Amino acid sequence: MSASGLPFDDFRALLRNLPGPDTAALVAARERDGQLTKPPGALGRLEEIAFWLAAWTGRPPAVNRPLVAIFAGNHGVTRQGVTPFPASVTAQMVENFAAGGAAINQICVAHDLGLKVFDLALDYPTGDITEEPALSERDCAATMAFGMEAIAGGTDLLCIGEMGIGNTTIAAAINLGLYGGTAEEWVGPGTGSEGEVLKRKIAAVKKAVALHRDHLSDPLEVMRRLGGREIAAMAGAILAARMQKVPVIIDGYVATAAAAILKAANPAALDHCLIGHVSSEPGHMRAIEKLGKTPLLALGMRLGEGTGAALAAGIVKAAAACHSGMATFAQAGVSNKV
């Protein structure tokens, strides 16, 4: 906790003092790119990804220790009947991750990515946001700090994902609280909500934002009132990665909502981040546009679990490999343009 005694103060200070990109590393990467055996710009966005890696790691583009971090949390708002699945599925899926049986496990194997799963007090759901704040300031700050530990073991590319029954309701509430509009614009099917369940989901988002409306000018208050433990932990992980020069790939609708909290607190807070994919959740593209980002992939996915970010990590690894492994015109004896 900060010297002032207010739990969020340390995070506010970090958000005011974010490190910027490494200009020298970026210039060096651009210079090397101009010497590689290809026409300028021929690798399209792969080139920009390589430059992004250089700028935010401070060294030549490379991905040697990529990590997918999944944060799992449960939500009191599920008592409002906003999802067809019981909250017990969150813990069951955490066990599935540990056993290697989920989609994210297979994608991590395919792309040689590390995987860590963080169980965030699943037996103690957050407060029902239609009736009370999801978390106290102290609990929210502590969960952010816990999320910051995701990179403690060392990584040079962090993929952020989540698992939590009810958390697309949470994400919709955050987006409505931050950006306005209507609940209908931000609420989607999530794990398959339709009919009366979807109506209850929309109603819950409306009620939650109305209840907390006098406190939504502060992004950290949006997070603690409308969010959840996985939201706070993902925000902490993204922030820690920035401080430690670790580029980040953000996954789907829920992870994007966590990122939006940081962006609202500091417009430069996500400069070290890419959006891995746009999901089929209806509000996701709108949320990405609010962040000023362009997703790497659009595969019609809506699973969460870091799956889209992990797939995008394969592209980032390829971008780094091309930049570092291609021959220059001089090395290959190939004539450059005149």
UniProtKB/Swiss-Prot annotation:
Gene name for this UniProt entry: cobT
Keywords: Cobalamin biosynthesis, Glycosyltransferase, Transferase
Catalytic activity: 5,6-dimethylbenzimidazole + nicotinate beta-D-ribonucleotide = alpha-ribazole 5'-phosphate + nicotinate + H(+)
Pathway(s) the chain acts in: Nucleoside biosynthesis; alpha-ribazole biosynthesis; alpha-ribazole from 5,6-dimethylbenzimidazole: step 1/2
Protein name (Swiss-Prot/TrEMBL): Nicotinate-nucleotide--dimethylbenzimidazole phosphoribosyltransferase
Top-level taxonomy: Bacteria, Pseudomonadati, Pseudomonadota, Alphaproteobacteria, Hyphomicrobiales
Function: Catalyzes the synthesis of alpha-ribazole-5'-phosphate from nicotinate mononucleotide (NAMN) and 5,6-dimethylbenzimidazole (DMB).
PANTHER family in the cross-refs: NICOTINATE-NUCLEOTIDE--DIMETHYLBENZIMIDAZOLE PHOSPHORIBOSYLTRANSFERASE
Disulfides per UniProt: none
CDD domains: DMB-PRT_CobT
Organism: Sinorhizobium medicae (strain WSM419)
NCBIfam families, per database record: cobT_DBIPRT (TIGR03160), PRK00105.1 (NF000996)
Family from the record: Belongs to the CobT family.
InterPro entries: Nict_dMeBzImd_PRibTrfase (IPR003200), Nict_dMeBzImd_PRibTrfase_bact (IPR017846), Nict_dMeBzImd_PRibTrfase_N (IPR023195), Nict_dMeBzImd_PRibTrfase_sf (IPR036087)
Superkingdom, taxonomy of origin: Bacteria
